[in-house]
Every structure is written in structure tokens, then in C-alpha cells.
Amino acid sequence: MYPAGVSEQSNSEKLVAVTGAAGHIGSNLVRSLLAQGRRVRALVREHTAGIDGLPVEVVRCDVTDAQACRRALAGAPIVYHLAARISVGWDPPGPVEAVNLGGTRNVVEACLACGVQRLVHFSSIHAFSADPVDGVIDESRPLAQNQPHTLIYDRTKAEGERQVMAAVARGLDAVIVNPSSVIGPNDFAPSAMGEALIEIYRGRFPALVGGAGFDWVDVRDVVASALQAETRGRKGAHYLLTGHWLSFVELAQLWGKVSGAKIPRLVAPMWLARAGAPFVAGWSRLRGKRPLFTSDSLRVLRNHRHISHACASAELGHNPRPLEETLRHTYQWFKQAGKLT
């Protein structure tokens, strides 16, 4: 909820700062904020393709720079923190920790120093402990711990949440949202998932991986619920913004249905994919490309089958659309943007 004395109407007239504004979720969020008639300060580190041409105030800000964060957030009562280093086995730990830990710490401290009225912190489903694998994941599940088997992305997102909650105890009004794997339009970079769909469309996936799946959610549904979290979310609360679980094979088949892509018939068992992951990673490095899958990403695709977004549905009205609609709109956007050639 908004702090006492701050109405939704008055808040809608105030400046909103968005870190990671040019990313996949960020560019969709910025568009939705503008559609509400709000003033947006878009914080970006380098690339601006996701927000080029939009009527926003663009500010260059590396979130690993504490002073830059304070300057960039000054005068913005509402902050959405999306800047993150998403990595499932393709980046060394240092850069991931610098952004997801150091960057979040800097943003939180800047929010406290600048008197921000509400922070909406974007975490991830990965922030929650993967064990037990077959258990239902909801907001009551413990955060991932710093254990030898914990993936660096999971650990840093969990620790980022702890930093936000520590700031809440110090007086910061913040709410946390935890999306699952996001798919949808305005995927300029593209994202890892968007790149996988493009590669499948181009026929560069020799085989699909059996025994793998995840929870997939439309980026626009994530944004809509995050906007609701700003105005309706409880201070210090977490909200799982998830969609529908589908195996990777089922997702690829649905992608083929909406795009006309020829989907590989060969389905490799998980053990074979895991054995080949190091070779895929090495070949990708030689080509200067991000690997389509890694040992870590395959491990992720065996977890998180049972996820509940009941809390977000009840409190924020979260209502994920069918994946076929998401994939159809994603295909249409990729085609219009010239990313399928």
C-alpha cells in the first residue's frame, strides 16, 4: 500500500525511475507507465534500443556506482529496480555479484537517502530454494542459501532480496516481485529465452531436450501485476508472478504452431544433453555467442514445476494469459522487428 497520506492519484503524477529500463521487462514497463500518463526517468548502463524514441528522461547509470545511483534516483518518489545480471552458467561470478548484490545494495541505499516513497524490487523465482524439487513453491518457501550447490544467479538474487528486506526494517517502503521465465514482445536484445525461440525458428536447434520444463509467463502480465504491486502491494511482501508450466518440448511445439517453424523431431534425453553441455559452451565461446544451454540451465529446467501465484492473484489481480497467445504475439513482434531473418 502507499504510505499514509499519499494517494494513488497524486502518486501517478510523480516521477518514476526505472533501473534496467531498456531490458525486456524494463522496456515493457516503461511503455505501460507512459500509457498511464506518467513521467519516466529511464536508467540505462549502455544500450538504449528498448526505449529509443520514447518520451522519457534517459539517464546513464551503472548501478555498481553508488554515487551514480543517488544522483539518478534523486527527486523520484517511485522506483522500479530491474537492473540485473541474468546468468545461468555463462558468466563468471564476479560480474553477477557486482550487479545483483552490489547494485541492489546501492539502489536500496539511494532509495533511503533520497526519501523514495516506494520501491518495487524485481527479484526472480530463482531467489527461492530449489529444494525440495517436487514441493510447491509459494511465498513461504525459504530463500536460496549460499551453499556449494547453489547457482550464482540464485544466490545473488536471494541475497538481493535480503538486502531489500533489511532496508524495509530501516524504514524503506518496498515490495518484491518474483517473475518466472519471461516471454513476450519488445524483446530487443533479445533475452536468453527470446534467442532460443529465434534459433528454433531458424532451424538451429538440432534436437530438443526431454525431461526439461519451466514456468513461463507473459512479460505484459508481469508488468501489469508489478504496477499493481506499486499501489496495492503490502510493504515488505513478496509476490510470485508466474504463468504456466510446460515442458520445453511442449513449448517448442506450441512455438511451431504459431510461427510455422519446423520443430526438431529428435528429443535428446537429459543425461545426453548434460554430457554435451560443456562442448556446446566451448563452441559458443569460439563463436562469441551465448550458449543455448549450459549444465546450470539444464539443472534449472528440472526444477520449479509446482509454483503457486495464488497470493499475487488474490492481492494484485495477477491473471496470466494462455501461452499460445504469448507466443503468437512474440512471433509477430519478432517478425516485425526483423529478428527472424
Please provide the spans of the model-predicted regions.
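N-terminal Rossmann NAD(P)H-binding glycine-rich loop of SDR-like oxidoreductase domains
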Residues: 14-36
